[in-house]
Amino acid sequence: MKITEIKKYPLAYEGRESLFIEVLTDNGLKGLGEVGVAKMGNAVIAAIEHLEQRLIGEDPWESEKLWQIMFRGNFFPPGVIYSSAISAIDIALWDLKGKSVNLPLYKLLGGPVRNKVVCYPHTQGSTTQELVDNSKRAVEEGWKFVRWGQPETHGVLEEAELSEQMPGKLEPIESVRLATEQMALVREAVGDEIGLLLDVHTRLDTAHVIDLCDRVKEFKPFFIEDPLRSESPHAYRNLSKHVSLPIAAGEQWSSKWQFRQVIEEDLINYARIDLCIVGGITEAKKITNWAETHYIDIVPHNPLGAVSAAACVSLCMASTNVGVQEMPRRPGTDSNDLFPVQISWEDGYAWCNDLPGLGIE
């Protein structure tokens, strides 16, 4: 089995941009991949075309060697555009390997340590009341977690407050106050057994994160996500000295080296690995195993489509250190025209079927 071509499919559908790829082989098998930064589509496509020339004629089973060729081949370390291109190709190579031996990806990764993976949706709202209503609806649908963004990060603001501010602007003091009010109301609405996740989306500084965590501590959130900007992972060292709530971070980091400090110094509790940015299955599995040695669970970042979802759930099914899996759209209800065969979902859990590779078509 040799690689013959890589096809690119930039798409805009259902209000978002996506970039899927197919790695074609001389025996007719095709592997699917997905790019993590589709909004940078033209740049990523150029990177994929550049990498394609290095991969023609290569054996997909030699994925570790091919990963090293892609990552090291330009001398300079790849940024997020190249790492996203590498990620999509690497995921497609693993999909091909599974298809070539008629085995699901999670079995190639060591076999299942769980038969399903607990997931969380995105529960948004243009007002706090809408957020509360959507959270209650998610629980009624079977979800065991609810997640929303720091006020104004995803447009979740009181209507009266929104009219007084510039659209898209986040005032930290007011945002922290609103986030506290929202968490109190959501906790009251969904009960004590549902996990609450607040995504700060890297929009606060250390002092305001400490204030936020002090205020919401009584509501026992499952974690606070990406509270600080990602350029300086060492900033989590100072935060960890003052915050007792679990912290999740890492969705913007594009290699295992960017995770090094927060894992080695135990600065986070959950590693938000993005398989479609960090380097694909090959790199994500290494980070997962590394995190396990520090008793850090993974919470794979998955804001994308069916390919990303299948790759994430495959990794989680084959890994012991898993917290929860992001799943913004319930599998089987999203992009069915593109992928009529997808992973399964029921009552807040997702799992891969015993179809070869990623298990989607």
Please report, for each region that a protein language model flagged, where it lies by residue.
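Structured beta-strand/loop patches that form or line metal/cofactor-binding pockets in enzymes
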Residues: M1-L32, G36, D334-N336
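Ligand-binding pocket scaffold of soluble enzyme catalytic domains
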Residues: I21, N27, L32, S100, ...
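Metal- or metallocofactor-binding catalytic centers and their adjacent structured scaffolds
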Residues: L24-L103
